[in-house]
Amino acid sequence: MRIEGSVAFVTGANRGLGLAFARELLGRGVKKLYAGVRNPEGVGLVGIIPVTFDVTDPAAVSAAALCCGDVTLLINNAGIGRVDSSALDPAVIDNAREFLEINFYGIIRASQAFAPVLLGNGDGAIINVLSDVTWFAPPILSAYAATKSAAWSFTNALRVDVRDKGIQVLALHVGFVDTDLTRGFDVKKSDPRLVAARTLDALEKGHEEVLADAQTEALKRSLSPNSPIT
């Protein structure tokens, strides 16, 4: 898919990776850019159109797809995460329910709402922001990892379903990204600007998957018995 001249809708575009996507898209010459956010007044980036959007609200998602009928690129970026003390933490169940509503059901809602829009506008694309914990889940991220694994499965099914209809589906796998949400983690983090750029490069090349950092590449290789994770 060609970014220049496209019309994009980015969920959670008011901060972090979503904001990085918005800036990168503007820099690449999108025709129009919608920012799907819960509070449109909190969007300060010049050049984007704020749209009230909550992935947990089916009516809001449907309304956004209806009012943004010229979209050709959907980026499902909105997400939530929180650490557990362990996989046996009683809070895992409640956390998983909360995370599923946004990280999994939210992607399904947005994809189902916007797919007819993309089809109506000709060739289009969907980018789903996933994680490296899709493949390797540390105990403190057990609930979060489960929701991202579920989202990965849906992404793969969606790709098969719409491929012959002209819609490209790209899965973004990445580890910790340097945003306000990861500020408390003392780990190596990726620059959100580089992640956004690498993802859009992959989209324009027609890829189905992008591994945005070295750790994610290593984790994917570890799925092979010949390259176990260490």
What residue spans do the PLM features occupy?
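C-terminal helical subdomain
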Residues: 171, 179, 183-221
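Active-site helix of classical SDR
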Residues: 14, 111, 147
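A short, exposed helix-loop element centered on a Lys and neighboring polar residues
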Residues: 111-112, 156
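Residue(s) in the substrate-gating loop at a strand-loop-helix junction
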Residues: 131
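Rossmann-fold cofactor-recognition segment
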Residues: 46-58
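Conserved mid-core segment of classical short-chain dehydrogenase/reductases
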Residues: 81-97, 120, 140-143
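Active-site-adjacent segment of SDR/Rossmann-fold oxidoreductases
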Residues: 136, 157-168
